[in-house]
Amino acid sequence: MTPQIIAHRGASYLAPENTLIAFKKAMELGADGVEMDVQQTIDDGLVIHHDYMIDLHTDISGKIYDMTMGDLKELDFGSWKDAIYRDEKIATLQEAMELCKQMPGCTVHLELKSTMNNDPEFVPRVLEVLRQTEMVEQVILISFNHALLRQAKQLMPELRVGALVYGELESMLLPPPIIWKDLGLTNGMDDMDVMDAALPESAADEENCGWMTRWISDKVSMLQANFPGESLNEIYKNLMAQRDLPAYISSLDFVPEWVSCEYHTAYKSAGFIDALHEMGIKVSLWTVDTEEAVRSLLRTSADAYITNRPDRVREWAEKELAATAPAEETPAEVTPAEPAPAAEADTGAAAAE
């Protein structure tokens, strides 16, 4: 059985991530749902965007939490991907939910991005939009900040929630594809052996150096927001505890319906998916973007793949499942019976059937 295909930030390989056009395109490509990120503006608006910084997706430098909804709505969030998406606007949570409501079968994995001021009204504001748009049944609320999920469960017990857990800290801090492209590299840990050669040139380039500094700062801010009030040592201990996922999830004072982790975890911690299934918890893996990854992960019992390639992942999965399906047994050859005497012809015919 093919796992659910959930489009990471929409069809983000083909369209600007986390925009309405990306969500539409994902469902047109046959995805079972979309994943998106919601965060709060300085005037308590709710917008769909992954990073706090907007530098990678607009022509200005800024942070979502320092800007108003009006400021953000004036910006072009599409041209960075391709000129055909010029003037694509940042989506509000309300707009995104209304769109997904119109798309039959669209499950939404909605990630809560922690507020920098630990605002206790953030989760209630999100839940109110889900109520207003009648999207409670279609949404799975996910977050790395498990305190936010606990609050959501207390306020809306019927809402499904999913605990996001960290993979390797190094991979979390890796720059996104657009920065690797600027450095003449691809994106991934495989490039670490050649990155040293690119760093002197990029460090001498004020623009590239600025991008890298702002990117790392943004990621560290996000990590601190997910563990408010904790020292770096306490944060590290928390991350280490997450390596034994069944034990960590059992230690929570609420029960998530889903756990979502980096797909490499499936290679490092054999059996954890089955263990979570025994606890009644489903598992999604991110970010599954290659045919090789699909082939290997189909050996696990993961329930969903979060992917930037909803246009290809289902095709790869179905191809692999067809290739590894047990061959149908060929019926044994039946030797025709000798013709029966005329008086027994009917009986013989019946036996041959």
Where are these regions (language model features)?
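Phosphate-group recognition and catalysis centered on beta-loop-alpha active-site segments
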Residues: 1-353
